């Protein structure tokens, strides 16, 4: 079987969804700039050899509608001979794009793919036009479509306290801020034009959503937002609303080597799994277990892990049941996570994978895992290996 490898991976800075730096920048532009960036950074690649552009996006309407993958690729000047498709596995959409490209390469159905994802949550809110079938209530809990309530449920089932959630959120902001000021995000962030608070055009080079002033004391005063009476999940322990895109150049290994392109990581294994929709945040556990089994390794073999922080109340049960509580500070989300950076839905899968690969390089690590939960009860996971 042929090997699928990551040649390059970049992301936009994460912009605040409410009056943020990308308030005047469309989702197609965020996407197209990254596509162009990959080609500029890898001039050995002939764009005419691109098989397909696979782009994750959840809210495929308004500016994100009518196959945003094709719209963005045309904006980017990618040859019209390349295909383009938009995929939707909710929060796991751009990781699904990674998997689709990898499967195509492994089975000989193409050797060069641009993949990624985008979500402009400021322009297209996450609940825009959502209309669940009434019959779903016969099969899943009625609150399963409300992500915050599923986090409350998962946290209660696993005995996660408010204080544990607050501490996890503080850690996310502190680590993301440290990564910013120490330049650890510099290699993965691709600068995009946006606008500052005065409306002036600027090149955005840093994430806008990190709150370095976050403390246990500042979080303690926040009220629960999803279950005001008995809940523990607050805005401060939930992933921030942000706008952003991420992208990767994925190729067949021998072709990349023949062109003299870097092999930043090999895709070792992939998996998806389902779980009860009422505790959708638990999905990373069964997905990770399947991916590890397919890779022939155990969780102890992993050097670095990126777990998407939809909610602290969701992340901590996954960490616990994967047997990772004792190594959180050595292995997990070392540059912070979505609580600090935000979770632009269609962007996040490739974003956490990009952050993971850069962390693996920084730490000279061999094996890494990127995994995330998915609304209505799914998980997705990818094991990467540096070679």
From Swiss-Prot:
Highest taxon, organism lineage: Bacteria
Compartment(s) where it occurs, according to its Swiss-Prot or TrEMBL record: Cytoplasm
Record-listed E.C. numbers: 2.3.1.16
Class of enzymatic activity (EC top level): transferase
Keywords for the protein's UniProt record, in alphabetical order: Acyltransferase, Cytoplasm, Fatty acid metabolism, Lipid degradation, Lipid metabolism, Transferase
GO cellular component terms attached to this protein's record: cytoplasm
Function: Catalyzes the final step of fatty acid oxidation in which acetyl-CoA is released and the CoA ester of a fatty acid two carbons shorter is formed.
Family of the protein in this entry: Belongs to the thiolase-like superfamily. Thiolase family.
HAMAP family recorded: FadA
Name of the protein in its database record: 3-ketoacyl-CoA thiolase
GN (gene name): fadA
């Amino acid at each position: 079987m042929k090997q699928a490898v990551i040649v390059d991976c970049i992301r936009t800075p994460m912009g605040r969804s409410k009056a943020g730096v990308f308030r005047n920048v469309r989702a197609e532009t965020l996407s197209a700039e990254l596509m162009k960036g990959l080609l500029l950074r890898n001039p050995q690649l002939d764009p005419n050899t691109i098989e397909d552009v696979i782009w994750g996006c959840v809210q495929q309407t308004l500016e994100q509608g009518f196959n945003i993958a094709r719209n963005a690729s045309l904006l980017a000047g990618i040859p019209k001979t390349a295909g383009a498709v938009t995929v939707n596995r909710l929060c796991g959409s751009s990781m699904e794009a990674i998997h689709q490209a990898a499967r195509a390469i492994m089975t000989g159905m193409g050797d060069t793919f641009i993949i990624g994802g985008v979500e402009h949550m400021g322009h297209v809110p996450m609940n825009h036009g959502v209309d669940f079938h009434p019959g779903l209530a016969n099969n899943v809990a009625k609150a399963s479509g409300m992500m915050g309530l599923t986090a409350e449920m998962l946290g209660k089932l696993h005995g996660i306290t408010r204080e544990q959630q607050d501490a996890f959120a503080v850690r996310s902001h502190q680590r993301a801020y440290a990564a910013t000021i120490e330049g650890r995000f510099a290699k993965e962030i691709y600068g995009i034009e946006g606008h500052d608070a005065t409306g002036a055009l600027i090149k955005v080079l840093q994430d806008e959503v990190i709150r370095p002033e976050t403390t246990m004391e500042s979080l303690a005063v926040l009220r629960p937002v999803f279950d005001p009476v008995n809940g523990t999940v607050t805005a401060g322990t939930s992933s921030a609303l942000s706008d952003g895109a991420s992208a990767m150049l994925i190729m067949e290994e021998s072709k990349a080597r023949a062109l003299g392109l870097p092999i930043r990581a090999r895709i070792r294994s992939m998996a998806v799994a389902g779980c009860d929709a009422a505790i959708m945040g638990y999905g990373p556990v069964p997905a990770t277990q399947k991916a590890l089994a397919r890779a022939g390794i155990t969780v102890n073999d992993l050097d670095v892990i990126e777990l998407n922080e939809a909610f602290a109340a969701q992340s901590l049960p996954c960490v616990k049941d994967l047997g990772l509580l004792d190594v959180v500070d050595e292995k997990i989300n070392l540059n912070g996570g979505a609580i600090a950076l935000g979770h632009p839905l269609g962007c996040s899968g490739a974003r956490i994978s990009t952050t993971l690969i850069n962390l693996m390089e920084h730490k000279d690590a061999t094996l890494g895992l990127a995994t995330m939960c998915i609304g209505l009860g799914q998980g997705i996971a990818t094991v990467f290996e540096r070679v």
